[in-house]
């Protein structure tokens, strides 16, 4: 991968990409952690919230081709990353304005714009670091991933302080996070224009060996896609409504205390990802991928029946820490020349499909059950029904063949 305006400022590049990851993953949790519970307080029903979350995921998927297009049009990856940060600033700003003006259509529009913003960072951040650090990118990628997990954990707390800390729900205070995203976006753009950027890359044509390997591996890739889609559907459905569940079912008022509890649950991935990576090196990729899926589902059911946040912590630890392990298994069982294509399929079809379907199914089921059991029990029933898919996903791992090679599991996604 070519580089232009190369500087020795590796630390600056790592700092900017890490801050970008922190902001991107943090903003992604403002939507289900802050915006959706506020909408629920405003008597927006589960079906509407589920559809809104599903459209957010769908738009994020449809916006994916905009990322390489933006890279080509601007002439660099970091410039595209800066534009993605500015998109986050715009989307969160529109949401804040919608709450201030009591215009729900602006809040909805902001959530959908956030879907576009969410498409940018992840395919760009690793490309920038891999280009700058080359074969020594492992540590940089790990630090970068840790900042993503940290942002995901801290933003619900920080946003709760801003929005709920004044004693009333004041959604307009989300403008602070819009401003931060814009400032970092501008900083990235200035740095990329003056010092360093990663040039666009031309894709290579597929070889005959590539086509032959594809024919042999297509069934396996399809199986891995189904496994991941089912698991991600459950995960997305639960993540969409977990904030509402804490508020309505566990009666945790929307306050700084609510944000602290949600942050604690989400922080589980900070220890979970290296722990699962370490365990998988000892007991095997497939087994750990299967067991972690069962563990996530079992702990979540225990959380539903007991209301204990300890069970929620461990459930989310296995939920949020499993994806790097799945990607490692894909890299192990698929021929080397197909790894990039296979991981792309798993990401774009399984993860995106799960995100779209999971929120939609959970929201519609919650709305359906609410007519019979009431709002609180309706949401509880919906989550218990959806989590069954996780057990199916866990069982399907027995059909995946033993990997012919063992690759190191990335500690942070």
Give the ranges of each region predicted by the language model.
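Extracytoplasmic gate region of multi-pass secondary transporters
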Residues: 31-32, 220-270, 358
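Helix-to-loop junctions at the C-terminal end of transmembrane segments
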Residues: 63-76, 272-284, 366
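C-terminal ends and interior cores of transmembrane alpha-helices
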Residues: 86-101, 294-307
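Cytoplasmic helix-loop-helix junction between adjacent transmembrane helices
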Residues: 110-148
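Helix-loop-helix hairpin linking two adjacent transmembrane segments in secondary transporters
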Residues: 135, 143-195
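A membrane-interface helix-boundary motif in multi-pass transporters
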Residues: 163-180, 364-390
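C-terminal transmembrane helical hairpin of 12-TM major facilitator-type secondary transporters
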Residues: 285-329
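A late C-terminal transmembrane helix in Major Facilitator Superfamily
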Residues: 336-371
